[in-house]
């Protein structure tokens, strides 16, 4: 199995096969609009703008499991991201990343790259770098800023 074998609902509620991103380097992030890390949206958008023409995308998966910091509807989330951070990278419908109802995409990501203290996602803005073949190559903690990931993205784009 690879990342591209899964699907998820895009922010408009329509199913989207992740195979649509095959051949791209991806940064997959669980996001929230009312979190101390929310300003990372700017850095994520900057990475997307810088590298999208080279085969890179950021995929945002809003999640309300951590401190109820993503209470809005999918439409409200999209409006917030666009208005405040100019986000135009793909956003998906709100999901759960941990527990019995964790989305299959996140079950896969966590099984491929566990964290320091087990597989569970600990907070918003945990990031996974996925290579062009759909393999999870790195997992980053929430406090790792998008700017610090640029070098790893460059390496994957050059492979």
Where are these regions (language model features)?
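N-terminal "domain-start" segment that seeds a small globular fold
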Residues: 1-19, 104
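Short, internal strand/loop/helix patches
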Residues: 7, 75-123
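Amphipathic alpha-helical repeat scaffolds
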Residues: 10, 30-34
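Preference for well-ordered, secondary-structure-rich cores of eukaryotic proteins
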Residues: 10-13, 85, 147
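Conserved helix-turn-beta segment immediately C-terminal to the redox Cys motif
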Residues: 24-25, 34, 39-62, 81-85
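Thiol-based oxidoreductase modules, predominantly thioredoxin-like and allied folds used
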Residues: 55-73, 88-99
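Thiol-/selenol-based redox modules, centered on thioredoxin-like
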Residues: 107, 111-159
């Amino acid at each position: 199995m690879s990342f591209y074998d899964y699907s998820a609902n895009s922010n408009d509620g329509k199913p989207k096969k992740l195979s649509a991103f095959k051949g791209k380097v991806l940064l997959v992030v669980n996001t929230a609009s009312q979190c101390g890390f929310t300003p990372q949206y700017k850095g994520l958008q900057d990475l997307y703008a810088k590298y999208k023409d080279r085969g890179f995308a950021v995929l945002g998966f809003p999640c309300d499991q951590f401190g109820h910091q993503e209470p809005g509807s999918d439409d409200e989330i999209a409006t917030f991201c666009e208005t405040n951070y100019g986000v135009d990278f793909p956003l998906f419908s709100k999901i759960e990343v941990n527990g019995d109802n964790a989305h299959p995409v996140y079950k896969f990501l966590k099984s491929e790259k566990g964290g320091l203290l087990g597989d569970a996602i600990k907070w918003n803005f945990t990031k996974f770098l996925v290579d062009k073949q759909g393999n999870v190559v790195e997992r980053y903690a929430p406090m790792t800023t998008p700017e610090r990931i640029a070098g790893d993205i460059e390496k994957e784009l050059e492979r």
